[in-house]
A protein has these predicted regions:
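Membrane-proximal helix-turn-helix segments that form the acceptor-binding/catalytic region
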Residues: 61, 104-122
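Conserved acidic donor-binding segment of nucleotide-sugar-dependent glycosyltransferases
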Residues: 274-275, 279-285, 295-300
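Aromatic "clamp/platform" in nucleotide-sugar-dependent glycosyltransferases that forms part
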Residues: 242-243
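Short alpha-helical donor nucleotide-sugar binding micro-motif in glycosyltransferases
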Residues: 229-234
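Short hydrophobic beta-strand element within catalytic cores of glycosyltransferases
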Residues: 259-262
Length: 419
C-alpha cells in the first residue's frame, strides 16, 4: 500500500515527530511504501533524526509523478497541496484544531478552520478532537489513533526514587516561547513566585523570544534521548498551555518518573488525573500555580505519590509499534471506504466561509471605529491648548484647579493629557 504524508518541513517539533514515527512503523512492520512529501522549498536542513534515513523524502513535484492509495495532509497549510498529489483517497491527520493557534483577528485562523470542511477522511490522536470532528462533520469518516511512546528512549524506571526535602524542587519548563499559547514566560514567572527552594530548567528548541529569564539553566534544542534524561532528573514538569492536541510532554515526563503541574488544557484528560498523578491549576493564576509547586516542595510524600502514580500511568500507555498497527488499519479502512460526499463537504465549506467573512467584517468595523476614536483623541492631545496644559499640569496651582475634573473623569484626563 502506497501512502504519502504531506509535511511543511522536517524541522524538530512534536507534530513532525509523530508523523515520522507513524511512517516508520508502517514501513518497518506493515509493508507500506511511505513517502514524506515536502510541500514547499526548504531553506533549513532537515532535523538530524536517525529514523529519517529509513524513509523516502520527496518534493511536491516528485510526488505528483507518483500515484498513491492514500495521500494524507498533516497540517492545515499542507491541504493546499493535498489534491495535487494523485491518490485514490485523501485523508487529513488532525493533531489539533489548528485555527486555535492564531489570534482571533488573524487571517490564518479562518483559513485553518475552513480546512476541516474538505472532502477527506479524518485521523486524529485525541478523543476531544475526534468528538469535535464528528460533531462538525458527521458525514466524514473519523478515526482515532493515539500517539505512542518510544519506550526505549523514554524508558520507565523500575523504581521511582524518593526525592528528599533537603534538595530543592527540580522544576522543568518546556515549550516554544514564541508560541503565545504555550505561555512559557507565564510558567517561568510562576516558578519565580515560589517561596520554597527550587531549581528551574527551561528547555526550548528556539531561544528567539525567550530573552533574559530567571532560570538556573536554559538548554535546547535537545534530542529525544537528552530530553528523556532531563525528565528523569526533574521532579515536576510545569506546563501552562492554553492550546494542545494530545498533550505529549507530560506523558513523556511520566515515563521518566516526573509528575506534572498543568492547566486543564485540551488533551489533559487522556491520561492526567488531578491529585493522582499530577496537579491541575487554574488559568492565569501565577500565585496559585506557585503555591501548588510550593506544596510539592514541602510535602515530599505527596510528590512521591504523584510521581509513582505517573509512572504507573505510563506503564499502561502503548508504544509506537502498537499504535503503528492502528494507523495501518485506519489507512486501509480509508482506502477501502467510499470517497467522502463532496456535496456535503462543499455545503459545510461555503457555510463556514460565509460565517467567517461576517465575523471578519465585524472585526474590521470595530478596528476602524477604534482607529477613528484614536484619531480624534490624538488631534485633541496635539492641540496647542493641550500641549500648553501638559507643560503646567504638575504645578501646584494647576493640580488644585483640575482636581474636580480629575475626580470626575480621571481616565479621560489621562488620555487627553497623556502620561
Amino acid at each position: 500500500m502506497k501512502v504519502a504524508f504531506l509535511v511543511n518541513d522536517l524541522q524538530l517539533s512534536g507534530g513532525i515527530g509523530v508523523v515520522v514515527q507513524h511512517a516508520l512503523q508502517l514501513v518497518r512492520h506493515h509493508g507500506f511504501e511511505v513517502a514524506l512529501v515536502l510541500v514547499r522549498e526548504q531553506d533549513d536542513p532537515h532535523w538530524a533524526y536517525d529514523p529519517l534515513e529509513d524513509l523516502r523524502i520527496l518534493s511536491l513535484p516528485q510526488a505528483c509523478e507518483q500515484r498513491y492509495d492514500v495521500a494524507v495532509a498533516t497540517w492545515w497549510e499542507t491541504t493546499f497541496s493535498l489534491f495535487d498529489v494523485p491518490a485514490e483517497r485523501y485523508a487529513y491527520f488532525v493533531q489539533s484544531l489548528e485555527d486555535r493557534f492564531y489570534e482571533p483577528d488573524a487571517a490564518e485562523r479562518l483559513g485553518a478552520g475552513l480546512t476541516i470542511d474538505l472532502p477527506v477522511a479524518f485521523i486524529t490522536e485525541a478523543s476531544w478532537i475526534a468528538q469535535t470532528l464528528r460533531d462538525l462533520r458527521p458525514d466524514a469518516l473519523c478515526m482515532i489513533v493515539r500517539n505512542g511512546i518510544d519506550k526505549d528512549v523514554f524508558a520507565i524506571a523500575e523504581r521511582v526514587e524518593v526525592r528528599l526535602q533537603s534538595a530543592p524542587l527540580r522544576v522543568l519548563v518546556e515549550g516554544n516561547p514564541r508560541s503565545w499559547f504555550k505561555h512559557v514566560h507565564d510558567a517561568i514567572d510562576a516558578v519565580g513566585a515560589m517561596r520554597e527552594p527550587h531549581h528551574l530548567t527551561v528547555v526550548c528548541g528556539d531561544r528567539v523570544g525567550l530573552g533574559d529569564v530567571r532560570a538556573d539553566a536554559v538548554v535546547g534544542p535537545l534530542a529525544p534521548a537528552e530530553m528523556a534524561a532531563l525528565y528523569g532528573d526533574s521532579d515536576v514538569l510545569l506546563k501552562l498551555s492554553s492550546v494542545e492536541g494530545m498533550f505529549g510532554p507530560p506523558l513523556e515526563a511520566f515515563h521518566r518518573g516526573a509528575t506534572c503541574v498543568t492547566t486543564a488544557v485540551t488533551g489533559n484528560d487522556e491520561y492526567i488525573e488531578h491529585g493522582w498523578n499530577a496537579l491541575i491549576c487554574d488559568w492565569d493564576d501565577r500565585h496559585g500555580t506557585a503555591r501548588a509547586l510550593d506544596l510539592l516542595a514541602r510535602d515530599r510524600a505527596l510528590l512521591h505519590f504523584l510521581r509513582a502514580n505517573a509512572a504507573d500511568t505510563a506503564r499502561g500507555w502503548p508504544d509506537w509499534r502498537q499504535q503503528g498497527g492502528l494507523m495501518a488499519l485506519a489507512l486501509r479502512r480509508i482506502r477501502d471506504a467510499a470517497p467522502p460526499d463532496g456535496v456535503a463537504a462543499a455545503r459545510a465549506l461555503t457555510s463556514d466561509l460565509s460565517a467567517g467573512m461576517r465575523l471578519y467584517a465585524s472585526h474590521m468595523q470595530q478596528r476602524n471605529e477604534f482607529a477613528h476614536q484614536a484619531h480624534v483623541v490624538s488631534r485633541l492631545r496635539n492641540h496647542p491648548l493641550m500641549v500648553r496644559a501638559r507643560r503646567v499640569r504638575d504645578r501646584r496651582w494647576a493640580r488644585a484647579l483640575t482636581w474636580p475634573l480629575r475626580r470626575l473623569a480621571p481616565g479621560m484626563l489621562r488620555r487627553l493629557l497623556g502620561p
